[in-house]
Amino acid sequence: MLALGKLLELTLAGREPAEKTQLTVEGVRMRWLSEGALEVRPPEARDNGLDLLLSAGIHGNETAPIELLDRLLHDIARGDLKPRARILFLFGNPEAIRKGERFVEQDVNRLFNGRHEQSSGSEALRACELERLAASFFSLPDRQRLHYDLHTAIRGSKIEQFALYPWKEGRQHSRLELARLRAAGMEAVLLQNKPSIVFSSYTYDKLGAESFTLELGKARPFGQNAGVNVSLLETRLKQIIEGTEPEMAEQGLDGLQLFSVAREIIKHSDAFRLNLPADIENFSELDVGYVLAEDLANTRWIIEEQGARIIFPNPKVKNGLRAGILIVPTTDENLA
């Protein structure tokens, strides 16, 4: 196996490779760009025009997605997986990955779309570097652009594997991409309706990629991810990489639950209180009239929406950040 296939090993050790560029027997070029960043380029005759960005480890304790990318890289470096797409592999927050922590000082996934410019520290610099790497990768004209940012969650979920689909004014969500997600094992997709400061939103909004945050299960340490079943996703990623995806039929959305954002719960002060059990699962339903959260100046969030569910509840976020998202079921009538 080519040494550059061991990107995770290099990243965990904080080392640079002796050789920055290597070629497989079939002529696939692997090029180390910077810490946790590796570009894979197929021979020109095999290139099918897809640029695929795969990122994981934006949160350092979410190891199942990191292990998945590591397996794909090993397969490419051994010549077992023969890419027809250009691929950029990114391990998002190497420092936090080495520590086994979600982040060191700041949540990197709250520092995109200009937010890192208002901050300081190593993680703000890393968010800036990730934007630069993605922008450079997606700079070639007349190519398809696809980005999957892979995560696991800090809590359990009634729907274990789901995706978040960013939003941009004047751009419709793609039915074809949703069918692809369904084939990759996603059970639900949250169709967002406003700009965001996460990585997938940056590549969708600024770089024109079809971009998604994928949540794959519960966050666990390295080597303890047997309970996180990514087999469907892994199979689909290999097919995308090799250009062997089956045709996706119109009924490809069967069984895929669609949700839209009703409201974001923003924590304004240290007095903020979220009236939910600490172990509540993502996608838990909330009754109309329930007082979800309270803050200063008699601010209260009361459930008004039928069928409302909560995802990503986290009262420990910094003031000014999102402490949860209220979502409601939606239909596929506005898809492109």
UniProtKB/Swiss-Prot annotation:
The alphabetical list of record keywords is: Arginine metabolism, Hydrolase, Metal-binding, Zinc
CDD domains in UniProt? M14_ASTE (cd03855)
Q: How is the cofactor bound?
A: Binds 1 zinc ion per subunit.
**Which cofactor does this sequence's record say it needs?**
Zn(2+)
The pathway this protein participates in, as annotated, is: Amino-acid degradation; L-arginine degradation via AST pathway; L-glutamate and succinate from L-arginine: step 5/5
Q: Please give the catalytic activity noted in the UniProt record.
A: N-succinyl-L-glutamate + H2O = L-glutamate + succinate
Tell me a Gene Ontology molecular-function term this record carries.
Answer: hydrolase activity, acting on ester bonds
**What EC number(s) does this enzyme carry?**
3.5.1.96
**Which InterPro entries does the entry link to?**
AspA/AstE_fam, AstE_AspA_cat, Aste_AspA_hybrid_dom, SuccinylGlu_desuccinylase
Listed binding positions for Zn(2+) are 59, 62, 151
Similarity annotation: Belongs to the AspA/AstE family. Succinylglutamate desuccinylase subfamily.
Name of the protein: Succinylglutamate desuccinylase
Report the source organism: Pseudomonas fluorescens (strain Pf0-1)
Q: What is the lineage of its organism?
A: Bacteria, Pseudomonadati, Pseudomonadota, Gammaproteobacteria, Pseudomonadales
Q: Which gene encodes it?
A: astE
